[in-house]
Amino acid sequence: MSATLQSFLPAPKYSALPHSRDDDENDEYDNTEAGPSTSSSSSALVSTSSPSIPPYGQRAAWRPRTQADYANGGAYPECHVAQYPLDMGRNRSAATSNKLAMRIDGEGNKRYDAIVKQSLRPGQTVQTEFKDLVPLSQRTDIKEKDRNSGFERPSHEEVMSNTERTRLALEAITKGKNKPVVPKAGNLPGQQQAAQFIRYTPAQQGAGNGTQRIIKMTEAQRDPLEPPRHRFKKTAAGPPSPPPPVLRSPPRKVTAQEQKDWMIPPAVSNWKNNKGYTIPLDKRLAADASGIQDVVINDNFAQFAEALHLADRHAREEVRQRSIMQQKLAAKEKAAKEEHLRNLAQRAREERAGVSSATPSVLGRDDDVASRLADSDARPTRATPRAEGGMSAMLAGYRSDSDSDESAASDEEDDEGARERDRIREERRRERQRELRMSNMGIEQRTKQLLREQNRDISEKVALGLAKPTASKESMTDSRLFNQGESLAAGYGDEDSYNLYDKPLFSGSSAAAAIYRRPAARGGANDIYSGADDTALEEELGKNDRFGLGQSKFRGVQGDADRDSGSGSAPVRSGPVQFEKDTSDPFAINQFLEDAKRGIKRTSDQDADDARKKLRDEHDS
């Protein structure tokens, strides 16, 4: 097989000779890299070429590799390599190199497990292959007897030997750790040191005193109460940590310009000068440092300011246009409102003038008929819509279509005119009723009406003609504010006083005081009610009947009875009417409770009385 394989392989370029132990690892690596076939072929070549040693003078490219190359002789001087004939001069100690030789298994794969298997103790196992992870029961490369060989129960002797070996190892570790801690017997305090014998030979041998002597040295006795001589001292601080490395250029000489640039002026304060030094102005300005830096303004600031200015101007223009438009709309609305109010006022004045001239009186019937006749004579005669409708129906056969259309249009105009006249009559009627109510209005209602008229807007007053022009144009302030006191505390009262109501309720308002007081023009109450004149009393009651209750509602019951009986007028009361207080039980609850306590039963008479009372109550309701 080897011959057949060599027949296919090319001729070797170099002669492959076996390596010796003294060769370096590179040559061994090259040899093992070639694989088992190459090693076998090389061994064959060695076996054939080992006896053939080149003659002297032709050994420049030849190297002795094995002990057979020396032929039991010495080294070859012409071969400049390390030679160890008969292993003479070879270092037998362990190699100090940490390089490992590359090894190859039978299949040509490199064995990398040599890295972890180096420097192992005897009996130590390292698992470096994948098959080591497979359980032994599933391994196919192990025989059945080898598979169960490692699972036998150990014997008693093996267990005891392993236990004893483990105990001794643990004791050795423990003693090694405790040895520095446990002191010797002689080093314990209070114990006497053992005596030492020292052979002493003097240096001077003259005068016959050079004989050797043996000296017994013992420890001197120490006083147990003596204070300790050892003093604790502060240990000197160790050297500091080295400075960190700084990567910088080598130092060079500083120029005058650089010194000038690096010159920092002294601090000169603008507020303090405790020493009173006279500081030149240029030094003060140099210390200010305001002019050292050049102020660089970005162009975007100008653009931003310009944009803000344009936006502000545009916004102001929009606001101005909007305000102008609002003013125009407000003026137009105000003008329309004034025009509307002016038209209303004009219409009211015209209607009032028409009512006063053509409206009949309230009480006179003849004047009403006369005014209607005069109104009918003054207006042109026009047929009523019903008469015109009947006439148009009679003449329907004698008219054309155009005449009928004209008649229909005229009818619509007449109807519209009639509706307008009805509306005017209704407005005039309402106006007359309003005037009548105002004429019959009491003082209170009239005061409220006056206040309502005073609270009108000035534009409404101008439109209705009620506004009065100001007599003087100089008074532009409210004169009512000048008659006030200094403050609230000036005229109100002292803070310790309790008289909260220092003035009457309606002392300052004449309109409100008139509600509860009779006007002086109509006479006081004493003038009317103190006298015995019945005519004046009835007249006053008839005039001041505000609520429409009539005079009979104001008369006393006792006075009516006396008047009916003819006994005369009612007795004059000196004070207000006194009402009697009903102290009895109106619902008979107390009587009911007393009856219930006594246990009184209801009789038939009481039931009949209750039935009559219930019937009477239902009839009254």
UniProtKB/Swiss-Prot annotation:
InterPro entries: SKI-int_prot_SKIP, SKI-int_prot_SKIP_SNW-dom. Residues 36-51 have a biased composition (Low complexity). Residues 403-417 have a biased composition (Acidic residues). Residues 140-164, 220-229, 364-380, 418-437, 594-621 have a biased composition (Basic and acidic residues). One of its GO terms (cellular component) is spliceosomal complex. It holds the Pfam family SKIP_SNW. It is found in: Nucleus. Residues 239-248 have a biased composition (Pro residues). Its main location: nucleus. Residues 1-73, 137-164, 220-251, 347-438, 542-621 are annotated as: Disordered. Keywords: mRNA processing, mRNA splicing, Nucleus, Spliceosome. One of its GO terms (biological process) is mRNA splicing, via spliceosome. Involved in pre-mRNA splicing. Belongs to the SNW family. Associated with the spliceosome. PANTHER family: NUCLEAR PROTEIN SKIP-RELATED. This is Pre-mRNA-processing protein 45.
